């Protein structure tokens, strides 16, 4: 059975009534051999981690101290979180009472102690849902099952968002741009509600174009997830820049002042411009390639520490 599977893979597209046959290639054999010999892959299985990528975040956290077990209310947002390895690390290295939300366009069962929604991080409504999830108005002692269309909790969040959208508090939190300049007793509360996240981690990457197989909501939406690198360094670089910018916009909108940020980037000619945008948002910006990253990989990680106050998206992106 294994030999037959390795020799040939048949993909049946029921909507088009066609069979696509793809033979195994030397590159697939090399990838499989590399996986079997890789020490991080083996150790991930031993530690019951969902992928070897967990060790990259561990090494980043060892150096930059993103998570804290001493903070009882740390709020962590994991972008492109499926299959959930980074969320596992965040759960292990933060306090039991910390709140962790994974966002991915694929439905994926989150690790124990982690919540998730299926959503497109490029959509403003997703930012509203994230903000609402971390707000004191959304009670987290509810049980929700994995939904075929939207993962966990999103249907509850959608209902809650509809209920609170016309309230004065919603308008104050979601539309206020002058919370720093208005000295009143509620300014700290409003700041915390508008910028509810302490740490944003992003390991997003983007897929190949899909030309067939659109047949239901899950596969249609899941396709737009940041899924597979192409192996073409120029293409991977430009796609990763777009996703890093999307993560950076999320940080501008949701990350609290002095908060921390991590994103993966494939190196290339636009890297310095992205670094400049990072420096407009964070006081300290670092570039780091963990030992768990393969030597031949073009990936690197940018870490932003101590987010600045009064960051304007237009200024950040128009000046770089």
Swiss-Prot record:
It is an enzyme of class 2 (transferase). GO terms for cellular component: mitochondrion. Pfam families: FtsJ. InterPro entries: RNA_methyltr_RlmE, RNA_MeTrfase_FtsJ_dom, rRNA-MeTfrase_E, SAM-dependent_MTases_sf. Disruption phenotype: Loses mitochondrial DNA with high frequency. S-adenosyl-L-methionine binds at residues 83-86, 104, 178-179, 203. One of its GO terms (molecular function) is rRNA (uridine-2'-O-)-methyltransferase activity. S-adenosyl-L-methionine-dependent 2'-O-ribose methyltransferase that catalyzes the formation of 2'-O-methyluridine at position 2791 (Um2791) in the 21S mitochondrial large subunit ribosomal RNA (mtLSU rRNA), a universally conserved modification in the peptidyl transferase domain of the mtLSU rRNA. This is rRNA methyltransferase 2, mitochondrial. The lineage of its organism: Eukaryota, Fungi, Dikarya, Ascomycota, Saccharomycotina. The gene is MRM2.
